[in-house]
Amino acid sequence: MRIGLIGAGNLMTNLGKALTSAKEHEIVQVWSRTKESAQALAAVLCTPFTTDLDCVVEADVYILAVKDSALESLIPQLTRLHPDALFLHTAGSMPMDVFKGYARHYGVFYPMQTFSKNKEVNFREIPVFVEANNEDVLEIVKNLAATVSDAVYELTTEQRKYLHLAAVFACNFTNHCYDLAARVLEPQGIPFSVMLPLIDETARKVHELSPHDAQTGPAVRYDENVINRQMAMIDDENTQQIYKLLSQSIHDKL
């Protein structure tokens, strides 16, 4: 399958590598708004690049991994230039119908993972959630996803919105809490690395226990002495509010 990559960020860097490794596809080109990004990914994938939408070459499938705001502006021009192609976006929070009225064949290819350009991942372990505008296209998208992942799921736009919301809680907010922890430790000269065994064990536990059953800490028993003492140690008002709200939420839901 001839594939054009629209975008050259964290997700596309990892997906591009996975598609190339699958040996069943030809990455015909990388497009990005910035030459530096397009050139860097194209070099990794040994394929041409462009920054001009009018110069995007013919492909069977175009996979779009760009900011949500950019997606809506790219679709009209890209679909007009390549009316017979299949178009897939990779956004967890965008509806499939963003293509409606522009493309004949379209769908969603959403790999749910946190990606960084310089951090290798095993793409076969990453769940990919797919959707398409008809059954024939859905079969193509499923087969494409199966070449890079062992966990392919069909999900509607409505379901995917909630999946993405859950991912924000499980990943983005959790990582922000790591950052807050690092900011607490730094003035005391304590390296963040001491937290890693705790973080790893917390993640391991939910492989065997539900998150509800795995919850520990002063908020479980609502130990107000500890909670109030720790809140008083926090200088930043926003961080203090986060501590208070999370403690209350833990207590209320147990």
PLM regions with names:
Residues 1, 26-29, 59-62, 83-87, ...:
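Short active-site oxyanion
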Residues 1-51:
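NAD(P)+-binding Rossmann beta1-loop-alpha1 motif at the extreme N-terminus of oxidoreductases
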